[in-house]
Amino acid sequence: MPKASASSAKMTASTSNVSSSNSKLKKSKASSPSASPEVSTPSTSNSNDDQDGHVSEDMSDAEEGESQEHSASGSGISDHDDDDDPSADKDSPAADEEQDEKKVATIADDGKKVEFSDLGVIPQIVEACTNMGFKHPTPIQVKAIPEALQARDVIGLAQTGSGKTAAFTIPILQALWDNPKPFFACVLAPTRELAYQISQQVEALGSTIGVRSATIVGGMDMMSQSIALSKRPHVIVATPGRLQDHLENTKGFSLRGLQYLVMDEADRLLDMDFGPIIDKLLQSIPRERRTMLFSATMTTKVAKLQRASLKNPVRVEVDTKYTTVSTLKQHYMFMPFAHKDTYLVHLANEQAGHSIIVFTRTVHDSQRLSILLRLLGFPAIPLHGQLSQQARLGALNKFKTGGRSILVATDVASRGLDIPAVDLVVNYDIPTNSKDYIHRVGRTARAGRSGRSVTLVTQYDVELLQRIEAVIGLKMTEFPGGNDKEAVMLLSERVAEAHRAAVRELKDKGVGSAGGSGKRKRKMDGKYGDDMDRDDDQVQAGLPVSGNGRHQNQNRKKGRR
């Protein structure tokens, strides 16, 4: 936990720059209302070092060069220091402010191609959209942005990959341009990876107006995050548990002047039992604010949260049927359970040079298959909850930049993450929940692009496959080349040898368990031991914590276990 005096001193010192920044804003707007200020490009890290397939090097390689603070300082926006505004109401919306569903407007689809400028977006942000390759707004953006620009609360329902992030980010940035303040907006996300991704989009979309953002998530150093908050960013992107920690323990930090609150992936936020923490957060921010809630589904919990936190919202919907996109080709490969690894290697060999995500059910299989593939010459890297936060970000960065073409991941990567060019999604373990399947395959065929998915089906998985087909409303086809048993079995001896080597490696390092439960057998040594899968956010969400996790988080309040 950061020391209060150090954090307070930093925050006090940072306020001295506010008055000088105000004059810059006036000059910038007076010179040309439509001219774009200097572009401030957010920094990115790139890791290119090689790995040799060993567990310790897999994880340490992934940890390279990732930092938790994202800030893009520019000349476009300066801050009005209104944190101590006495008019800010700290009370949360009363529970009796229920919204009659008949009064919630639903906007119909029109399918019309429009430009961002047609939606009322200012030239500075249109320029940023162009720089990011956004040619036209997506349907959810067409519907949500004009309503949000009119300072209305918004409920957005859209499937994964529909462009929800820009739909709430653009109106916030435009309001910030008109009325720049520190701690102007806060975005809540259910996972750390999604929080970092949102922060990157905020900085990219705000690069032409000099937006500063901070990412506040569990698994990272509290002191460093306190320093980031002392710089008074315009936008905070956070996971609920760690944000609540800072509100309670970081001296000088508050959200009394907050203007915008966004809850992204709200259904998942509530599925992870963050509801009590969100209730506390709502009591720490002004009632007079704009609130946006985005979700893939309108569950009972989401509807309850809507009534408690939004005022007279407009409801915008796009493709609310829970299904896969039409540009996705979905296949299966049928095989004996005993030769599952061999079929996976055969598939990876057939798809060499393509970007592939392999989804597993357990941490053990994620790590084992990553090592197995590396031993056979495939550039694979793992992503799972037992990696440190820096390692998880590093793994994503390597996969996004092409340093590794195969990402072997648990469901930590199945939702919310926008990886631009994923050619193929492989379900090594078929998910038991149809929604999990939809989110997994949603990592490809995004934003109108085409993509493929292949589900590995053994004699034990036929019923699960049929259940998924019933939900998505189509029959999967057999993957071309998947029935060439002779070609597959030629690889069996080498795959079996690589499997034995991978299991020995895992046993030596104590990662996962031979039974595939995915839980740690003992404290991981080296850089593995610095992270706990069940840290701040999971603890506050009421999820179980290992003994090691409690021991390594001595700074956490005892009541949050």
From Swiss-Prot:
Residues 1-23, 30-45 have a biased composition (Low complexity). A motif (Q motif) lies at residues 114-142. GO terms for cellular component: nucleolus; nucleus; small-subunit processome. Keywords: ATP-binding, Coiled coil, Helicase, Hydrolase, Nucleotide-binding, Nucleus, Ribosome biogenesis, RNA-binding, rRNA processing. GO terms for molecular function: ATP binding; ATP hydrolysis activity; RNA binding; RNA helicase activity. PROSITE patterns: DEAD_ATP_HELICASE (PS00039), HELICASE_ATP_BIND_1 (PS51192), HELICASE_CTER (PS51194), Q_MOTIF (PS51195). Residues 339-487 form the Helicase C-terminal domain. ATP binds at residues 158-165. Its EC number is 3.6.4.13. Residues 1-109, 506-561 are annotated as: Disordered. Residues 100-109 have a biased composition (Basic and acidic residues). It catalyses: ATP + H2O = ADP + phosphate + H(+). It is found in: Nucleus. Interacts with the SSU processome. Belongs to the DEAD box helicase family. DDX47/RRP3 subfamily. ATP-dependent rRNA helicase required for pre-ribosomal RNA processing. Involved in the maturation of the 35S-pre-rRNA and to its cleavage to mature 18S rRNA. This is ATP-dependent rRNA helicase RRP3. It comes from Mycosarcoma maydis.
